[in-house]
Amino acid sequence: MMWNWMASALALGVTLVLYDGHPLHPEATVLWDMARDERVTVFGTSARYLALLEKAGADVAATHALPALRAICSTGSPLAPESYDYVATRVKPGVRLSSISGGTDIVSCFALGNPALPVRRGALQCLGLGMAVEVWDDAGHSVVGEAGELVCTRPFPSMP
């Protein structure tokens, strides 16, 4: 999926910044060094990386000026509510933080960020366009305001 996003970005004239290596080596802030130096505007990462960065005690906000950074997108697993707090206090206060859900198998996002909506701690902001998605409990019933499985209930326009 990231390949498709990168190809689309390149077609629009965007400059991509990629890192090849361990995201916490040689030090926990190596990706933020790169983001600062390259004036990254949108930083894509994983929920696990943000949790590990917090565990390492990195105070990015205190050590890195990131004036170009407008948004951080997190994927790979649900972003813990504590990670929202960490980004808001120790990475870049006021940055748009979007937890997204989708994947390689669908080449799309079921849910993603939206700059017109507020960011809520521990929540996905909105469904992707054309996505019929519900949360189901263990019995296979649609639930609202409860934890469960994210289920796509109908085909969607960009379905592979």
Q: Where on the chain are the PLM-derived regions?
A:
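Active-site-proximal flexible loops/turns
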Residues: 1, 27, 106-112, 144
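Well-ordered alpha-helical segments embedded in enzymatic catalytic cores
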Residues: 30, 49-52
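Gly/Ser/Thr-rich phosphate-binding loop
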Residues: 6, 11-14, 40-45, 54-121, ...
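Thr-Gly-centered strand-to-loop micro-motif
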Residues: 19-21, 74-75, 136-138, 153
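Short, glycine-/Ser/Thr-/acidic-enriched flexible segments
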Residues: 22-24, 49-50, 79, 115-117, ...
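Hydrophobic face of alpha-helices
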Residues: 50, 84, 151-153
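Conserved AMP-binding/adenylation subdomain of ANL enzymes
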Residues: 1-41, 56
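Conserved ATP/PPi-binding loop(s) of AMP-dependent carboxylate-activating enzymes
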Residues: 126-128, 141-160
